[in-house]
Amino acid sequence: MTEPLVLMFSGIYGGANGLNQIDPANSKALETLQQMQPQIGQQLQGFASLYWGGIGGTSGPPYAGLVICLFALIGLSSVTNQHRWWISATIIFSFMLSAGIYFEAFNVFMFDHLPLYNKFRAPSMIMIIPTLLLGIMALYGMAAISSETDFKAVLKKYKPSFIVTGLILATVFYIYFTSSFKSESEINLLSQIAKIPDANQKAAFETPANDLVNAIVTDRKSLIEGDIVKFFLFLGLVITLVFLAIKKVINQTVLLVAFRILS
């Protein structure tokens, strides 16, 4: 149910299948595979995937962007935005549809009754809708912020968006500190190896498999750590730019160009 967080934190669930989301020079999983005996490594390399979310596999997350999401939340909390309610409802509805088996009763009903929904190859395809709507809302947010003249008023006016941002960040930290970072396939692999009756065959696979899974976990943690660092960096830059614009150190054109670059 927390998979939509990939819109804002692309690496929270590993990003994509394989090991391409991380620099090969820094990949502990790749290093571990290279140190294995060739025969063992060939049989285990199929399990070397950074993605550990709930949709089985993916070529990449529907990443909207940190800055886009931050401004989208501001746009959705703007009282002058006449479209915020139906867009908010559509985004939430899309999240519910994308949950698939994690919200099974609802999705089975939608599959049977929502026109054309049964033509989708996977429930996650619906994520293209919130990605588009967040981009539209980000434009509202940028326009709203760029017209402000009082920094304290900004903090008060858009307080709901800051609260939601804080809750999202708290959820990310909760996932980071409480998750095993192991996929279902890896748990099944270790379980199957533990059940091998032949002691020699079991010994040949058990240590390499555990080493590989632990290395993949390390890589996954490094991805989410990088996302968290990027979040605070981009948040700091956005706050600084807004403050400078309100104080007339930079004009609105420079502010909007800077927002576009960060996005």
Can you name each region flagged by the protein language model?
Residues M1-F71, G75, F177-F232:
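Periplasmic/ER-lumenal interhelical loops and adjacent helix-loop junctions
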Residues Q82-S263:
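Contiguous transmembrane helix-bundle modules in multi-pass membrane proteins
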